[in-house]
């Protein structure tokens, strides 16, 4: 495998197998642009991948993301794998999983839903993971994959 | 589940046991109301009715219910007479009103508004309709009406007629009926069939369902015919609407071959889907249904206030 063009990190988290083009969204959802520990965040886009054809990779220096935190990106990057790095070595590896409840990331696609008018954190219940289907806690309307992606 | 302080937002939050508690409390209160006239359960309590959208039956029956329970009522019947017109948020309106009252009833044009209100308020909130989403007290009074007429809900053949696609009333009613052993007949024009995901969910819950476009073919089977309005604006052109409209009107002719015990319900307001000539037949119970709104709402108010 050709060596990556971005440097390896000593300590931190590598989020691999992000669908090409979703890397920036992943950074946004995880709030990584405001990393307070002084560590760097490296983003590689459109990297060749055996599994996906093309993929994005995000490397977060000096921060170990928990499964719960990372699961927030499951909607934009369901294929993502997460590697926890210590002393340049992968010490833990897991796949992202769609959580049971999604809070704050998603906008309700129902134009008449109160969440589109009032100051309120959105909340959705995942009623099916495959195919993905969620129900709004407020207006109770369901959204399927295509609509979900359009409202992220 | 503890009733005192509980919010009534969606029929989805109800178990069968919850429904039964409401129905039996309503029965008890109706009886007491007949005996004593005026009750005292909610003496000293204040209900706030916040109607951001107009309503005749729901608002007046809630107010009547609170008065019958011995409580008092404050509120507004349209948003234009409140600070909402000045741009006040729902959150702030609720935070304010809860300082003045013990329970809130809200109707709002936006879906999810009642759920949000319930989260903002420390006092119980009852949903009286949020956009096209939920209207749980209507469903409860419908169930109460059926139970009162037949003594039971189990074993009945119940037909839902009209706009089954957009009608929130029929969706909630169908979901609640899934707790009981009923056969459900879904009668509507092709264009206004009940959404597939709801029909599937009901079937998964073990309900026997017959879908048809022809009222005359199934009406002879039914114990209950629940009629709803077919709105003109749902059709691409007027001709199509007129074609459909005629075949879904309940009149004396179509009632020639029905069971003697058939009961016809309607959430009202009606336009012309039930001919007024039907009103005087023994089948028509839609005005009794209106009456039943009072004991059912009395029951809900008394339960969430924790005074019964």
From Swiss-Prot, chain A:
MF term (GO), any: metal ion binding
A matching Pfam family: PyrI_C
One GO cellular component, as annotated: aspartate carbamoyltransferase complex
InterPro entries: Asp_carbamoyltransf_reg_N, Asp_carbamoylTrfase_reg, Asp_carbamoyltrfase_reg_C, Asp_carbatrfase_reg_C_sf, Asp_carbatrfase_reg_N_sf
GO BP term, example: 'de novo' pyrimidine nucleobase biosynthetic process
Cofactor: Zn(2+)
Entry keyword Zinc: yes
Record's keyword terms, sorted: Metal-binding, Pyrimidine biosynthesis, Zinc
Free-text cofactor note: Binds 1 zinc ion per subunit.
Keyword set includes S-adenosyl-L-methionine: no
UniProt: Zn(2+) binding residues: 108, 113, 136, 139
General function of this protein: Involved in allosteric regulation of aspartate carbamoyltransferase.
Subunit structure and binding partners: Contains catalytic and regulatory chains.
HAMAP family per the UniProt record, alphabetical: Asp_carb_tr_reg
Family: Belongs to the PyrI family.
Protein's recorded name: Aspartate carbamoyltransferase regulatory chain
Organism: Pyrococcus horikoshii (strain ATCC 700860 / DSM 12428 / JCM 9974 / NBRC 100139 / OT-3)
From Swiss-Prot, chain B:
Biological or metabolic pathway of the protein: Pyrimidine metabolism; UMP biosynthesis via de novo pathway; (S)-dihydroorotate from bicarbonate: step 2/3
Reactions this protein catalyses: carbamoyl phosphate + L-aspartate = N-carbamoyl-L-aspartate + phosphate + H(+)
PROSITE patterns: CARBAMOYLTRANSFERASE
Keyword Transmembrane (UniProt): no
GO molecular function: amino acid binding; aspartate carbamoyltransferase activity
InterPro entries noted in UniProt: Asp/Orn_carbamoyltranf_P-bd (IPR006132), Asp/Orn_carbamoylTrfase (IPR006130), Asp/Orn_carbamoylTrfase_sf (IPR036901), Asp_carbamoyltransf (IPR002082), Asp_carbamoyltransf_Asp/Orn-bd (IPR006131)
GO biological process, one term: 'de novo' UMP biosynthetic process
Keywords of the record: Pyrimidine biosynthesis, Transferase
Binding site for carbamoyl phosphate: 57-58, 107, 135, 138, 268-269
Positions of L-aspartate binding: 86, 168, 229
Subunit comment: Heterooligomer of catalytic and regulatory chains.
Job description of the protein: Catalyzes the condensation of carbamoyl phosphate and aspartate to form carbamoyl aspartate and inorganic phosphate, the committed step in the de novo pyrimidine nucleotide biosynthesis pathway.
Family: Belongs to the aspartate/ornithine carbamoyltransferase superfamily. ATCase family.
Annotated protein name in UniProt: Aspartate carbamoyltransferase catalytic subunit
Organism: Pyrococcus horikoshii (strain ATCC 700860 / DSM 12428 / JCM 9974 / NBRC 100139 / OT-3)
């Amino acid at each position: 495998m050709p060596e990556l063009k971005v440097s390896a990190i000593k300590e931190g988290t590598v989020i691999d197998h992000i669908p090409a083009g979703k890397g920036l969204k992943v950074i946004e959802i995880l709030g990584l642009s405001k990393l307070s520990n002084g560590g760097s965040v490296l983003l590689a886009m459109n990297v060749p991948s055996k599994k996906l054809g093309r993929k994005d990779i995000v490397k977060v220096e000096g921060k170990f993301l928990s499964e719960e935190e990372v699961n927030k990106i499951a909607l934009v990057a369901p294929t993502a794998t997460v590697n926890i790095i210590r002393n340049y070595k992968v010490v833990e590896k897991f796949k992202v999983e769609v959580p049971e409840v999604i809070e704050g990331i998603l906008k309700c696609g129902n134009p008449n839903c109160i969440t589109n008018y009032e100051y309120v954190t959105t909340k959705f219940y995942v009623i099916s993971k495959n195919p993905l289907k969620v129900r709004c806690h407020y207006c109770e309307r369901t959204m399927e994959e295509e609509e979900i992606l359009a409202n992220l | 589940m503890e009733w005192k302080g509980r919010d009534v937002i969606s029929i989805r939050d109800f178990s069968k046991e919850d429904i039964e508690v409401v129905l039996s409390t309503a029965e008890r209160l109706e009886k007491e109301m007949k005996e004593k006239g005026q009750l005292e359960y909610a003496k000293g309590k204040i209900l706030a009715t916040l109607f951001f959208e107009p309503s005749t039956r729901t608002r007046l029956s809630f107010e009547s219910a609170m008065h019958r329970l011995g409580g008092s009522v404050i509120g507004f019947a349209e948003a234009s007479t409140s600070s909402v017109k000045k741009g006040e948020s729902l959150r702030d309106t609720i935070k304010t009103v809860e300082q003045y009252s013990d329970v809130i009833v809200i109707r709002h044009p936006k879906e999810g508004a009642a759920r949000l209100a319930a989260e903002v308020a420390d006092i119980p909130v009852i949903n009286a309709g949020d956009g096209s989403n939920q209207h749980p007290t209507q469903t409860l009074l419908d169930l109460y009406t059926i139970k009162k007429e037949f003594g039971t809900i189990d074993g009945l053949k119940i037909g839902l007629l009209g706009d089954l696609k957009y009608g929130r009333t029929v969706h909630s009613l169908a979901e609640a009926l899934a707790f009981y052993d009923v056969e459900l007949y879904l009668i509507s024009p092709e264009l206004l069939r009940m959404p597939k995901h709801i029909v599937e969910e009901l079937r998964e819950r073990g309900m026997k369902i017959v879908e048809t476009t022809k009222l005359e073919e199934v009406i002879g089977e039914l114990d209950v015919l629940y009629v709803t309005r077919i709105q003109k604006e749902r059709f691409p052109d007027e001709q199509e609407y007129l074609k459909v409209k005629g075949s879904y009107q309940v009149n004396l002719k179509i009632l020639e071959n029905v069971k003697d015990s058939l009961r016809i319900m309607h959430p009202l307001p009606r336009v012309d889907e039930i001919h007024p000539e039907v009103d005087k037949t023994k089948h028509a119970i839609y005005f009794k249904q209106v009456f039943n709104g009072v004991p059912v709402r009395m029951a809900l108010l008394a339960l969430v206030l924790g005074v019964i």
